[in-house]
Amino acid sequence: MKKFKALLPIFIFWASIFAQDQFNNEFDYSQIIKVPDLSFVNQVYTGLDILEQMDFRILENKTIGVLCNQTAVNRNGRHLLELIGTHSNIEVAAIFEPEFGLWGIDDKRTKLIGNDRIDPVTGAKIYSLIERSVYPPDWIMSELDIVLIDIQDTGVRYSTYIPSITKFLESASDHEVSVILLDRPNPLGGLKIEGPLPRTEYQSYEAYHLLPIRHGLTIAEIIIMVNEMGWVKDLKRANLMIVPMANWTRDQYFDDTKLPWKKPAPYINDLHTLLMFSGLDLFRGTNINVGFGTDHPYLWFGSPWLAAGYFSEKLDRLKLPGVEFKEVTYRPVGSPYYNRVPQYDGRSCSGLEIIITDQDLVKPVETATTIITLMNQLHPREFQWRGHDYIDKLFGSDMLRVFVAQKKPPSYLSPQWMHDEMKFSEFRKSFLLYN
């Protein structure tokens, strides 16, 4: 960090040059804030790091709202709200929190004053975009000049952060409020794409936009796509500005960036958990326990009726890339991640541990659909879909459920979404900010 601090005068010099024409007009409705070339510094800097080095000048004398959570930290682990709180000429009038809250489900640092939750650093009231309404209140939006957004996305379509930001763009458009989004890495890298595109009739918060399950985009690249393509309701566009990262490349996973890891969701403990989440979150649409009620969500799965030894032998014969399986016996007890009881709570489960042997080769969606297909074939009476075909919303179509019913070999399924992957890979090119 000392090397980068030494660059601060140079950075401000260039920032002042760009002050007259600081935006890239490559897009019709979205602007990229220009920052100096820092390629000679061998470190990744998030949009927050860049904004901090600009001394938050674009926010001076503005009334702002902030949409963020616990992941909005700089390279040194300091939170966005803490950093802004040191600037008396920036007024934070409202804080908006996505799913799982501002600080995560276990953190109680917000103050309760009457019925209002207050951030102790900025003194701003906190509004949830999940619990009562998916939109921010109209009366507070009418008071804002800018909404600042900083959230570490998962890189996986199931997450609700992108839908929440999309709803925010709609409200910002209605109230003519500018949106500044600070970019962060896709923790799963920017090269791999896996899974089908959702069909329109199956779109939901888990499949909100036309993205593969693993999309390989940063949060800014997705939101630019949403804004440019008119994917906001009624083709609304926001005055969107992006503070990009410096020195992130698409071949980098999160552990390559040397940035501090903050769980993007309370059940995602590390990068390997996140990798398997991109496939095994489909198990929420089945009666298979996916490690909830244990310390190994998405890396363990099982049930009281699974013949784990025989099932492991069948999986090993399929030679799924980048993974190995090991038998485990466990008893799920409660869950710190949701206010709900995990499947088979308190019951002994036979299961398998997923061991990632090569994160560059593993295909989590193919792994998950193979397990589901094989589970149905080996345990046709015990295996069940849950929640009125909830699996269709997670998957984005009824393709998986229909395929499982047809009893075809598991390896026949993934080629069916290969065309979607190729089509999306070509489509996304014009929205990529990084090489």
Please place each PLM-identified region on the residue numbering:
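Short internal beta-strands
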Residues: 91-101, 182
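Glycine-rich, charge-decorated loop segments at or immediately adjacent to ligand/cofactor-binding or catalytic sites
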Residues: 104-108, 180-202
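Conserved functional hotspot residues or short segments at active or partner-binding sites
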Residues: 302-415
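Conserved anion/nucleotide-ligand pocket segment
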Residues: 203-277
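Glycine/threonine-rich flexible loop motifs
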Residues: 153-165
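Glycine-rich oxoanion-binding loops at beta->alpha junctions
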Residues: 112-144, 156
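Glycine-rich, aromatic-lined ligand/substrate-binding cores of catalytic
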Residues: 248-333
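Bacterial Sec-dependent N-terminal signal peptides
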Residues: 1-30
